[in-house]
Regions:
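N-terminal core-entry segment
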Residues: 1-234
């Protein structure tokens, strides 16, 4: 739908702007110095290309770095700082056009926002960063759609990324840069998990609702999850 495309284009433009604004910050230069493997994926604002995983991490960190990225007030979560770097690097890595780029953004962004509505505030109250946790799943499903993964492979990708998702909010104690890193890490894990699944690696199908799944592990247990938000109106 046009309104969805218009919103995503706005998020993409905003994300590119804040990436450029943060390009010379210490937390970005330190990541560039650490993640040096060359590849085909752009580091926005820099004359350098790296592999998809590293590009996702660095660009995602830059988008979220100064906290001017978009916000969905469901939990809340920051969609652009995960999805734009994840889909940009993936599209570049496998040489896809702008239409497929937008498709990947739609698929992943939708899942992040829906997961954020399942148990509002519960993840944050448990001590985790919702963008870091839910973002990994959006990134995984978005990248899976670009790779042409089957339904079973997409399901495995989500199960796999459940063991990669992370992000504690202890950065609040000292104001360190791990908060900035969280969306980038989630973006990179989407690339890894989708490719693992495409290659035949299996992940649990009950990653969201299972006894040891996301909402029983990362969410405050006195807030009852409503899983209908994941599939309602589809």
């Amino acid at each position: 739908p046009k309104d969805v495309v218009d919103k995503l284009q706005l998020i993409v433009m905003d994300s590119f702007g804040v990436m450029v604004s943060a390009k010379n910050e210490q937390y970005i230069t330190s990541l560039i110095n650490a993640l040096k493997e060359n590849g085909d994926c752009t580091l926005v604002g820099h004359n350098k290309k790296v592999n998809p995983f590293n590009a996702s991490i660095i660009n995602g960190t830059a988008i979220h770095g100064e906290d001017f990225d978009d916000t969905f007030e469901g939990t809340p979560v920051h969609v652009g700082s995960v999805m734009v770097p994840a889909i940009l690097s993936s599209a570049q890595a496998i040489n896809l056009d702008g239409q497929k780029f937008l498709k990947g953004l739609v698929v992943g962004s939708e899942l992040i926002c829906r997961l954020a509505l399942v148990a509002p505030t519960a993840v944050h109250r448990q001590g985790f960063h919702p963008t870091a946790i839910f973002g990994a799943f959006g990134s995984s499903i978005g990248v899976s759609s670009l790779l042409g993964n089957s339904i079973n492979e997409m399901s495995s990708g989500l199960g796999i990324v459940g063991s990669m998702a992370s992000g504690i909010i202890e950065y609040l104690a000292e104001g360190t840069s791990t908060k900035r890193l969280h969306p980038g890490w989630a973006a990179g894990c989407g690339w890894q998990s989708a490719n693992f699944a495409k290659s035949g690696f299996l992940g649990p199908r009950t990653v969201f609702e299972g006894q040891h799944g996301v909402f029983n592990s990362f969410a405050k247990n006195n807030i009852e999850p409503d899983f209908s938000h994941i599939i309602s109106d589809l």
